[in-house]
């Protein structure tokens, strides 16, 4: 009896969501276009990462090699962005990675993904609000910081911020009110802030290359106590002395550690994927918006971080407001005010971009019954999830008040990297699943999306699917290595499911040995070399097995290229970056997940909307997406 109950609960945790994307009904307002999405992605991304985080990472982790850290972080984000683009074309609904996981790998994984997305967006909001406060404080002579240090010090080192930030709380509450007014109004404000931001960043890059010096990329240890033009009162970093000088003062390990933190700077693009029910043409606008915003952001991060470290020795950079300080260092006093004002606009856009997707993920989870139902309430006049917006703003305000910027950023990176990994795995699984031949497939589309050529091609694809049924197969070595069918079957789909799970285990093993067993590898320890080589070889073999399986021919407006290599590479990069984060970050992450599991097993599991569906309802093996293709 007990086993039967456990089996039933296990089946409930793995149930998948039924989605009918051929229906356009939504309680939200469809009013956004492609330019709105690019502005939203760029605005939400080019904020604290470029104006604040660049200084902290250059000083503490990477030095001038921060440009390489941003390059590695951009690679991880582009790989994930392509996977998001395919799912945005396949399932244009509100929920982003949460929904993608729900229709593919089941409810428990979907909850984990959604819960981590909420964490990421809350922390993104909190960290940008703290950055806004620090930049504004620098502009007016730091009276806010002095007041906090004098009257509001918290004595909980390693747990809470030394100085609470009441001004960051006020900023969050103001923008929460703006978001409740409506999507169109928020998008207009965001575009204004983003345009100013891009102009300011262009000015910073040009100024940095004009006033900067390559000598700041070639510093030696002798220069640490003798900097030209400015006395650094404290050259020491949190880890001790500021490296060994040169372009890569903390070594390549410092570059990788910096990349794990810099990854935070590219997080904003996934807010585009949460707008599926508020975009006029989601199948084309979402992929284009994601790719374009990531390209623009990488150019900006690379250029600004290079300019920053050329203008000023990396160990003299201010952790909270490096750009105004750098312009002061090179003697451009007036420019520091222009940059500070521009950075406030950028941080405002970034704050809006961080706050925008948060209530939409909460709304999607609440509507599915995994979070409390009252959070799914939508205001009749503004067509926004008003309760979710207010609740998420309140939680973000508390986080901004209590926690430090660096701690917030690292914790955010874990949740986001996990979500990105699951989306990549979902793309891999879904592209090799069998179709259901007794249904006519219809790409999710708005009325004006498909031109006649696309419609003819889609009809031709559907006709070919209806006229060719995969032959019945038996599970064997021949089936694994050389399948007979040209179309996916249940057996080939199962092979890909098992292979994807195995690859995840192998990648985790490889990354753990590489990061935690670095010293053993350096000494040539046999066990470490065996695990590293064995996991890499097996991963290559299993990737080959997936490559041999027949791929779905269903037409989408955007597909991830180079399957199965690209999603697997995305998973590897994400897991490797996760392993670069410190132990304290993992402990805080575990506490957040514990709270989430209490909510899911105490409420979500028993109130899920999928539980109310007929257990005998026909579902396709690919996650119930027949009408989404």
UniProtKB/Swiss-Prot annotation:
Highest taxon listed in the record's lineage: Eukaryota
Glycosylation, residue list: 226, 235
Expression sites (tissue/organ): Ubiquitous.
Molecular function (Gene Ontology), one example: amino acid transmembrane transporter activity
Stated pH dependence: Optimum pH is 5.5-8.5.
Alphabetical UniProt keywords: Amino-acid transport, Cell membrane, Glycoprotein, Membrane, Receptor, Transmembrane, Transmembrane helix, Transport
Subcellular location: Cell membrane
Topology versus the membrane: Multi-pass membrane protein
InterPro entries found in the cross-reference section: AA/rel_permease1, Cat_AA_permease, CAT_C
Cytoplasmic topology ranges: 1-35, 83-102, 184-191, 268-287, 359-384, 430-492, 552-559, 606-629
Catalysis performed (reactions): L-arginine(in) = L-arginine(out); L-lysine(in) = L-lysine(out); L-ornithine(in) = L-ornithine(out); L-homoarginine(in) = L-homoarginine(out)
Keyword Transferase: no
Swiss-Prot/TrEMBL GO biological process terms: amino acid import across plasma membrane; amino acid transport; L-amino acid transport; L-arginine import across plasma membrane; L-arginine transmembrane transport; L-histidine import across plasma membrane; L-ornithine transmembrane transport; lysine transport
Extracellular compartment segments: 58-61, 124-162, 213-246, 308-337, 406-408, 514-526, 581-584
GO CC term, one of those recorded: apical plasma membrane
Subunit-structure text: Interacts with TM4SF5; the interaction is negatively regulated by arginine. Forms tissue-specific complexes with ASL, ASS1 and nitric oxide synthase NOS1 or NOS3; the complex regulates cell-autonomous L-arginine synthesis and citrulline recycling while channeling extracellular L-arginine to nitric oxide synthesis pathway.
Function of the protein: High-affinity, low capacity permease involved in the transport of the cationic amino acids (arginine, lysine and ornithine) in non-hepatic tissues.
Similarity comment text for this entry: Belongs to the amino acid-polyamine-organocation (APC) superfamily. Cationic amino acid transporter (CAT) (TC 2.A.3.3) family.
Record-given protein name: High affinity cationic amino acid transporter 1
Organism annotation: Homo sapiens (Human)
């Amino acid at each position: 009896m007990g086993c039967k109950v456990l089996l039933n609960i296990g089946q409930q945790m793995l149930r998948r969501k039924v989605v009918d994307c051929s229906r356009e009904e939504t309680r939200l307002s469809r009013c956004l276009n492609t330019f709105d999405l690019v502005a939203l992605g760029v605005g939400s991304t080019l904020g604290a990462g470029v104006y604040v985080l660049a200084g902290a990472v250059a000083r503490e982790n990477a030095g001038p090699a921060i440009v390489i850290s941003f390059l590695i972080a951009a690679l991880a984000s582009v790989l994930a962005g392509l996977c998001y683009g395919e799912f945005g074309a396949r399932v244009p609904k509100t929920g982003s990675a949460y929904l993608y996981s729900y229709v593919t790998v089941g409810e428990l994984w979907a909850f984990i993904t959604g819960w981590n997305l909420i964490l990421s967006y809350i922390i993104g909001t909190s960290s940008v609000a703290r950055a806004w406060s620090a930049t504004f404080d620098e502009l007016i002579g730091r009276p806010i910081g002095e007041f906090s240090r004098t009257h509001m010090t918290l004595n909980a080192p390693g747990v809470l911020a030394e100085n609470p930030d009441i001004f960051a709380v006020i900023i969050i509450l103001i923008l929460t009110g703006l978001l409740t007014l409506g999507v169109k109004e928020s998008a207009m404000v965001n575009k204004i802030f983003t345009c100013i931001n891009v102009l300011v960043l262009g000015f910073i890059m040009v100024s940095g290359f004009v006033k900067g010096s390559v000598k700041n990329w070639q510093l030696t240890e002798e220069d640490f106590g003798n900097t030209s033009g400015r006395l650094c009162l404290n050259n020491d970093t949190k880890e001790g002395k500021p490296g060994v000088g040169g372009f890569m003062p903390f070594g390549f390990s410092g570059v990788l550690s910096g990349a794990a933190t810099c990854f935070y700077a590219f997080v904003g693009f996934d807010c585009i994927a949460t707008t599926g029910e508020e975009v006029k043409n989601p199948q084309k606008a979402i992929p284009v918006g994601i790719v374009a915003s990531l390209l623009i952001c990488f150019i900006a991060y690379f250029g600004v971080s290079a300019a920053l470290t050329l203008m000023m020795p990396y160990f003299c950079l201010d952790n909270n407001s490096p750009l105004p300080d750098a312009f002061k260092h090179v003697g451009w006093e007036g420019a520091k005010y222009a940059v500070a004002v521009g950075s406030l606009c950028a941080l405002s856009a970034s704050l809006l971009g961080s706050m925008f997707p948060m209530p939409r993920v909460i709304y999607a989870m609440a509507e599915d019954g995994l979070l409390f139902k009252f959070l799914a309430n939508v205001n009749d006049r503004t067509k926004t999830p008003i309760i979710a917006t207010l609740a998420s703003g309140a939680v973000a305000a508390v986080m901004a008040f209590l926690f430090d910027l660096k701690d917030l950023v690292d914790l955010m990176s874990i949740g986001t990297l996990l979500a990105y990994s699951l989306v990549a795995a979902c793309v891999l699984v879904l592209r090799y699943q069998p179709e259901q031949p007794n249904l006519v497939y219809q790409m999710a589309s708005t009325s004006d999306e498909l031109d006649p050529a696309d419609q003819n091609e889609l009809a031709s694809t559907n006709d070919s699917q209806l006229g060719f049924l995969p032959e019945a197969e038996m599970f064997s070595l021949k089936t694994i290595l050389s399948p007979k069918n040209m179309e996916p079957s249940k057996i080939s789909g199962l092979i890909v499911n098992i292979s994807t799970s195995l690859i995840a285990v192998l990648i985790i093993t490889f990354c753990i040995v590489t990061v935690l067993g670095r010293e053993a590898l350096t000494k040539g320890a046999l066990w470490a070399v065996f695990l590293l080589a064995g996991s890499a070889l097996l991963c290559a073999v299993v990737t080959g097995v997936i490559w041999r399986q027949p791929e779905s021919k269903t037409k989408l407006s955007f597909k991830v290229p180079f399957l199965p290599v690209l999603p697997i590479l995305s998973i590897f990069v994400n897991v490797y970056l996760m392993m670069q984060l410190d132990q304290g970050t993992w402990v805080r992450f575990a506490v957040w997940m514990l709270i989430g599991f209490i909510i899911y097993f105490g409420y979500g599991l028993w109130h899920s909307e999928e539980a109310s569906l007929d257990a005998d309802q026909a579902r396709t093996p690919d996650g119930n997406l027949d009408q989404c293709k």
